[in-house]
Amino acid sequence: NSLRGGLWLERGRRSVTRDWHRLLDTRIGMNYDHRPYWVQFKDAYELDEVMYYVEDVARIGAFAARIGVKQFFVDQRRDERINGQQHVRSDSESDPLFSAGLTWATPVEGMEVFAGFSENFAAIPSGVLGETDPVVLSRVKPETADNIELGLRVSRWPLTASATLYDIRFDNRIVYVPASFVDGIDYLGETDGVYENYGGVHSRGLETALGYGWDNGWRLSGAHTYNKSTYLGSGDAKRDEALEIVEGAQVFGIPKHTLVLSADWQGEAWNFGLSGRYLGERYLDASNSEKIDAVTLFNAHVGVDLVDISPRLKGMAVDLTVNNLTDKRYLSGVDGGGSAFIGAPRAVSVALTVDF
């Protein structure tokens, strides 16, 4: 049995400024007057964070148990240096956050069963302080999440395998909403909207992985993820509809199925690898009205230890990597507004590694 604890202290100071400068002569170039003709805003941000944790680990025969608790205290401030010299402050204090885990080393060599639970907390982002009226901000709560997992893993040469069931509930999601959605007195002035807590996300799924190696240097591996992430509503049907959030709809940009397969070979001097990644269909928006097709991409790499060429090159290696091997045209990230970003074309890179 072992008991340990710790304390995390963080102190941050930063400033954000936007100023405008006159271009001297656009016919010649982009040279500009270094003295701004207008400073739009100049804000100072301060952060003071304290986190403590206590954890106890006990081992009884084939079982190992862990239980812990931690708590966050986050004090953030934003001060305007010009304009209205507004002062905004946010004190985020989490509840005591509990976590627990249990593992069982089964009678089968290399096989282990595990389970875990954890509570998580995310303080209000500092950017929210600059976008939300102080009165409205006082009603914003930190985001929270509860994680549960249950799984099995095997590590016994030449086989490695794992399967994990998970359930994650994410609450108090902070989103930007139009000013017309704000209840009560309009404190916004000229602001178009504010940040508020709005529903959440419920994710559950299964992650599996399998790998097998041979003594001749070859190894095959694969991993599959089934992920069902759906939106939780706010409890106000009209607000949900106005924000185009459908309770139970799949989170945009998140595929239900992801599959990765790879083959790698490691010799005395040379190494080689080829991998393929399948991304399932993804929705473009929170209402799931449009989606983009699934895509499969391939990557490859080859490397050599230069000591095989000359003993004087000991500790040096060269690696060639090709991403998007077939130069596939595809859509990658999704912005949630019905648009997607164009994926990167074929990219070739060479890296030299030197060990001293």
Where are these regions (language model features)?
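Outer-membrane beta-barrel translocator domains and adjoining extracellular loop/strand segments
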Residues: 16-23, 77-84, 125-133, 173-180, ...
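Short loop/turn motifs that connect adjacent beta-strands in outer-membrane beta-barrel proteins
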Residues: 1-2, 61-62, 106-111, 158, ...
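Outer-membrane beta-barrel "beta-signal"
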Residues: 344-356
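Membrane-embedded beta-barrel scaffold of Gram-negative outer-membrane proteins
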Residues: 15, 105-120, 141-213, 220, ...
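Signature of Gram-negative outer-membrane beta-barrel scaffolds
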Residues: 2-110
